[in-house]
Design a protein with these regions (language model features):
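Histidine/acidic residue-rich metal-binding segments in metalloenzymes
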Residues: 1-76
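A short acidic, glycine-rich active-site loop
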Residues: 48-59, 98-104, 178-188
Length: 192
């Protein structure tokens, strides 16, 4: 379940305490962007950020980070739905026709590392759990995936926290003509 607000997180936490098999995944966008993005006077800028659920008030972010730390939220996703600006314009006269979703797949790991690990919101182990181990467990492919043990698939990334870059539409690999993380300075990139 995509989790964008503290009320959803709390419902998931209570359900898990009762033994229900339910999982929560805040999107990297929900951890780092907020509903002020929709107040931009440039219609295209705001429309590019339309997704479901929407960005929420910044007040919800601390609770989502805490959920990742505590394990009541399990993974960080992106809901990568690469709708271009022209596609988003389908809703120029009717908000309900704006295709929901935005990019984020390419940026997820670096933004999570920079805004999570480097700020002390997540440990390195919590980062690995939220990006690899937990999803493998949820999908019942652990320990073949999501672990470094003998006999497991060798799906690894060499992560270098010393490689920095500024996120930009000019250099990203996505087909999108915008990037919701435009201008973010991030540290840590896959080396291999």
């Amino acid at each position: 379940v995509h989790v964008s607000c503290e009320q959803s997180h709390e419902a998931i936490r209570r359900a898990r305490q009762k033994g229900m098999r339910v999982f929560g995944e805040p999107l990297i966008q929900f951890l780092t962007l907020d509903d002020s993005e929709y107040l931009n006077k440039d219609w295209e800028y705001a429309a590019r950020r339309v997704m479901s659920p929407p960005f929420r008030d910044k007040i919800h972010q601390d609770g989502l980070w805490a959920g990742l730390q505590a394990g009541s939220l399990q993974v960080v996703a992106t809901d990568h739905a690469a709708f271009t600006t022209d596609q988003k314009k389908m809703g120029v006269d009717n908000f309900t026709l704006i295709p929901n979703g935005t990019g984020g797949l390419e940026e997820r790991m670096s933004v999570l590392w920079t805004k999570g690990v480097e700020t002390g919101r997540l440990t390195r182990n919590e980062f690995v759990a939220a990006t690899s181990t937990n999803i493998a467990k949820i999908l019942n492919v652990y320990p073949r995936k999501g672990s470094l043990v003998e006999g497991a698939d060798a799906d690894i990334v060499v992560w270098d926290p010393k490689i920095s870059k500024t996120i930009s539409v000019a250099s990203h690999k996505s087909v999108l003509d915008y990037n919701v993380f435009e201008g973010f300075q991030v540290n840590a990139q896959p080396r291999y």
